[in-house]
Structures are given as C-alpha cells and as structure tokens.
C-alpha cells in the first residue's frame, strides 16, 4: 500500500533545502532546518494538517551566513547543531518567541561558506548529558543537567 499524503507546506520564508526537522512531544510544533547558509530555523504549527503555518523564524545571531543542522526537541528545548556556531539551545515553550538559553562552541569559524563544525546533537541520554559531533574537532559529551544556566564539557577527544 502506498503512503497517503495528508498535508504539504511548499511555500514559507527562506524556503531551501529542507534537510531535517523534529516534532514536539505534544505533536503541535515542528522545528525544521533548511540547510542553506543564512536561512533561519522555522517553527511550524502542525496541530491542524489543513492549516500548517510558520509560527516563527530565528537563527543563532552569530553571523548572517550561519546554518542550523539536525535539531531535536526535548520538552520545551530545541537543541541544534549549528555547524560553525556549535551547539545552540533554544527555549521554545512559547513557539512564537524562541529564546536562546545556552550554547557551546565546538569550532572556531574562519569562513561561513562551508560545512564545518557541529553536525549532530543528541540530548536524550538517561544521564541528561548531551552528545555533540563536530566534523573537524571530534565528539563532545556535555553536562547539560541545567541547560539554562550552563554547559560543562565533560570529555572531548
């Protein structure tokens, strides 16, 4: 049996190479990243498939050419591997006004026109630690038991 299309969103701000996304635990908010330099992260209201809409757009605020990759929502927090800008954590408890609450730089950028730096993030370890993979500098295990206050590098090689 072939899949049945339930909905589409083909027109939205900074439409590009829609590379990755993650659905919130309640199934109402979807965070998506178009893997293009300078394109914002989008938070979508997907509570009604007949009326999918962009709630907000935002970025790391570091550079006009920054690029988000492979975000994961856990509770009210969106964890983003942000290439040159490292790990970025946003509070999305109010999806209309996401707020960056923490960050950890894994890569010193020299140019934003390449795919270098933090590529993946995984915040779902039982310990509460976060794993961040950086294509140039390796694997980071970060203590993120309270991401709003601080992140500590436990081990990196």
Task: List the predicted regions and their residue ranges.
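Surface-exposed, proline-anchored Ser/Thr-rich loop/turn motifs
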Residues: 152-157
């Amino acid at each position: 049996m072939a899949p049945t299309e339930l909905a589409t969103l083909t027109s939205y701000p900074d439409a590009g190479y829609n590379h990755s996304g993650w659905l919130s635990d309640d199934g109402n908010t979807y965070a998506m990243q178009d893997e293009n330099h300078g394109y914002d992260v989008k938070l979508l209201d997907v509570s009604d498939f007949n009326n999918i809409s962009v709630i907000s757009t935002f970025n790391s605020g570091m550079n006009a050419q920054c690029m988000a990759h492979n975000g994961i929502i856990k509770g009210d927090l969106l964890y983003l591997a942000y290439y040159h800008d490292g790990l970025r954590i946003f509070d999305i408890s109010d999806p209309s006004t996401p707020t960056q609450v923490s960050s950890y730089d894994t890569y010193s950028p020299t140019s934003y026109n390449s795919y270098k730096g933090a590529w993946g993030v995984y915040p779902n370890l039982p310990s509460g630690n976060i794993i961040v993979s950086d294509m140039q500098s390796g694997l980071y295990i970060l203590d993120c038991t309270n991401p709003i206050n601080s992140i500590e590098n436990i081990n990196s090689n």
